[in-house]
Amino acid sequence: MGLCSSKPETRDDEPENHVEFSAGNVHLVTTKEAWDEKLAEASRGGKIVVANFSATWCGPCKMIAPFYSELSEKYPSLMFLVVDVDELTDFSTSWDIKATPTFFFLKEGQQIDKLVGANKPELQRKITAMADSVAHDHRI
């Protein structure tokens, strides 16, 4: 399981390696207002939110991004978000992010689960369980 706990020192003349974090059905959140809008939209639709707090410089974040995108397409009953911890530093700090990637699972704006690190099998397991619970809730 990989994770990054601090930003590496880079020289100013080095181009940053940007990864496409918002592919598939993944929504890139760039403001607190956009976060609030997405959570409200998910609550209205009865969707569970999977929020990936990530960083462009983090190797494990880059590694898990395509898998996260695949999951977003496989489970459209969930809302998949990604937050760049460097773009929304204060907001990320308010979520007590100690390492990236950190995945939060939210229902009606409240945290119901959390996963720290790029652990594909565990992420798959948690997302499948969340999707199953949403499907079960809609059948009742």
Indicate residue ranges for each PLM-predicted region:
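Local sequence-structure signature of Cys/Sec-based thiol-disulfide redox active-site neighborhoods
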Residues: 15, 36-70
